[in-house]
Amino acid sequence: MKRWLATVLIVTSFAGCAPAGPSQSSSSVAATTDAGGRHPWTIPHQLRYATAEDIAGLNPHLVQQNVVSYMSSLTMAWLVKYDHDNRPIPELVTVVPTQQNGGISADGKTITWHLRHGVKWSDGAPFDADDVVFSTKTVLNPANNEVSRDGWDLITKIDEPDKYTVIYHLRKPYAAYVPNFFGSAGANPCVLPKHLLATLPNINNAPYNALPVGIGPFKYASWKRADSVELVPNPLYFRGQPKLQRIVFKIIPDRNTVTTQLQTHEIDLWTPVAAAYYDRVRAIPGVTALRQPSYFFSHMDFQNQHPGVSDPRVRQALRFAIDRRQLIEKVRHGLGIIQDTPISPKNPAFDPHIPTVPFDLARANALLDQAGWSRGPDGIRAKGGHKLVFDFATSSGTPDNDTIIELIRANWQKIGVGISVQHYPAALLFAPYASGGIVLGGKWDIIIFQWGGDVIGDLKNLFACTSFPPNGQNDPRYCNPQVDVAMAHFQALYSVKARQPYDDIVQQHLYTDVPDAIMWINEDIYAYNTDLTGFHPNQVTPFDDFMNVDI
């Protein structure tokens, strides 16, 4: 469900006040251009992208990271992708199945996928229904360290009547079938090549993961660990050849260095741009800064099974003691949509009736008193011999996070709560559960990062009792049976209008239970060379449409 929406994901991305639509600014530049009208620093048809995240792996079955989702959109095999307006479009299928076109049965329990003919993997092997069936079984194989299996357990039977048809039989209808069943939006798996992986007991340590073979406009050429990943056009892509001849994803952990390289024009594209750098990058000559509303949201997760925050009154108190307006003004340069539901206001599933929690230290103190946490001589509250001090995990090299944590620490001290900060490399912080990943392994008390909101507003993968890692991304380990019931009703309905009341119920419970505190809804910021053309990122899969991107 969530890769970038799914998604899964550092708070180095920026949060912003949502304008009515996207905005962009470009600094004027007086410079000579080549015969093609390009700046002298532009390398024709070669895009250089910068990411502050180190890369934990390239197989989206096993890794949840923004940059991996971007590369996967360009290289991997998806049944469905998304257009500029976040609408699903067929990729390896000839049509997106619906009840209206007969692709989904009247009872909602049968989904038929009609596959394209004549498609080849980037290594030349033919693609057919065998790959989809194999990939389905791969997701269902408990030996594989899948990032998410949300919805896959509903599949009771798979039919392959011919080499270009796959039929899923489900225990019950499933609204999130498009993004979750090999769709490019979210922390979802792609279709894998059976001919390369079928003989392995699991995919966890397969050599394939280092340079995956896929079906996209580009293919992997090299991965230099902690340095860069290079993509080149896939000559076998069924839609033809992209305009770009080379894409290099440069790993640059320090954002000051990224900004410098944007100024010296050693890179052409940077996203997500942190709020602290927005004014700087949009002032760089020859650079466009595109700003548009996001589906991503920044959040503070509480380890709900930790004795210090197992009581929802404590979590409510901690939320009251977060001065989000202060954080936005001091760290986010005034950019951020303050709200208390994880669903973006740009998503049709957004509930506008959820109230906004104010900054209120008096109410925070009162709630902690009610919960039985008393101040000690050092000012820190305690109960039953346990102090209210939390390990606060964050990613190394993210100064915005460090500033946010220190501002939070100052306010929490006023309510008798202490913080101990633990820094981790991004690759370890977001590593798979079985590889000792900090986030999914629950090796923290409190953590701030970001998630991508689901395309249809499905929250099961984040908050269901059955979605604890490694079976989902419910890393707060929150469990409310009433929420599970509402999410089950939501997922059983294909009609947006019919399922909305159930999503509203879920959002109301999350507001009251506070498994995590919503910090703000983000905006997506893209800083790029003004020579870049054809780049029109959407909210859910910004790199899905790259055929006509050029520089």
Describe each PLM feature range.
Residues 42, 149-198:
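Surface-exposed binding/hinge segments that line
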